[in-house]
Amino acid sequence: MSTDSIEVAIIGAGITGITLALGLLSRGIPVRVYERARDFHEIGAGIGFTPNAEWAMKVVDPRIQAAFKRVATPNASDWFQWVDGFNESGTDPRETEEQLLFKIYLGERGFEGCHRADFLGELARLLPEGVVTFQKALDTVEPAADNSLGQLLRFQDGTTATAHAVIGCDGIRSRVRQILLGEDHPAASAHYSHKYAARGLIPMDRAREALGEDKVATRFMHLGPDAHALTFPVSHGSLLNVVAFVTDPNPWPYADRWTAQGPKEDVTAAFSRFGPTMRTIIDLLPDPIDQWAVFDTYDHPPNTYSRGAVCIAGDAAHAAAPHHGAGAGCGVEDAAVLCAVLDMAAKRVDTAKDGTEGKAALITTAFETYDAVRRERAQWLVESSRVIGNLYEWQDKEVGSDASRCHDEVYWRSHRIWDYDIDAMMRETAEVFEARVAGVAKN
């Protein structure tokens, strides 16, 4: 490993990890990505990106936003519609309408969806060969015996690697988070939010035949008591993505996994009193069905995203319930800031005092800057996502099923995400970094 540059190890080859790797490589910063899976793999489900996330993609590397647009499916309308999935009369969804509760303008081609695997595949094709090493499950991170090598990474297969900086993009069940905070720390693990999601992709021909064109061509949020669902087209309109959420008062039954495939009967029961549109959507989902426990960092948020030369990003730092549809985009914002701080640190390495010690101090300052800029907003997203999930299921004691009050809450919370000024975030990042470097130099 060269000691003339900052070499970075990224743990996790999901969307956040690969986005970050592409951004660092485009800035000339050497990167290795270590992924525990056998290959690039994302769940067979849809994902959406809000306008702020697309802006952040451009900041990281314009090729990333172009890759997303290649696989994104435009909505038939630029308005996101929230409908009453519960109080719908009639029996045939092709002849009935869910009551429109409210709608919010997304902007031109805003909040488009795609298939996760399609997007990750596009990103992977942008990576140079050899950047990602698969079947590498991280065990520990510790300072290397030779200070010039930075951090020593040990993997569960007995192999090792070194890097000056380590970034955990290893998702909700992050090993890097455990290492950074301590395995016994309450925030070392995410916690069950007492909702799970039944996820599935319905061939569009079947969905269109059963529901009618208007109900499958754009993005809908179907609200109701103790359950709700999001539907939108993906894969260039060939599939209807369905995410049906169910409140679950019980503990998640599987200690070793947060996903399970089981009979559809519990999901069917949760939506049994809903209107014909939602009942038909659930009927169209496969049986058995994939169920995903919604874990997040709401109960015990990390009190820092960094320590020394180690930091966490994306779901590893701020796992959020998906009710805002903004978790992955928040990870892209993280990547934009991390690219900036490491780029600024790398440009100072040649003039850093004390050689290796100066490099280590710059990395620490870079990661502390990232923590200072990102943690408040990211944790707000975690908290707001919980609020939104309760609003959609009429569980908020003050709002209940009041559509006007629900709209007001959803509107300001959504726009706080969508309208975030990424350029201002980048200016703040540079200012905080320079101020911290100056403070270190004085000491």
Swiss-Prot record:
Q: Name one GO cellular component term.
A: membrane
Essential cofactor(s): FAD
Record GO biological process: secondary metabolite biosynthetic process
The protein's topology relative to the membrane is: Single-pass membrane protein
Active site residues according to the UniProt entry: 199
Keyword list (alphabetical) reads:
FAD, Flavoprotein, Glycoprotein, Membrane, Monooxygenase, Oxidoreductase, Transmembrane, Transmembrane helix
Q: Mind telling me which SUPFAM superfamilies this protein's record contains?
A: FAD-linked reductases, C-terminal domain, FAD/NAD(P)-binding domain
One Pfam entry for this protein is FAD_binding_3
Return the EC number: 1.-.-.-
So which residues are the signal peptide here? none
First-tier enzyme category under EC: oxidoreductase
Check the record and name the InterPro entries matching this protein.
FAD-bd, FAD/NAD-bd_sf, FAD_monoxygenase
Q: Describe the family membership recorded for this protein in Swiss-Prot or TrEMBL.
A: Belongs to the paxM FAD-dependent monooxygenase family.
Its name, as the record gives it, is FAD-dependent monooxygenase orf3
Protein species of origin: Aspergillus niger (strain ATCC MYA-4892 / CBS 513.88 / FGSC A1513)
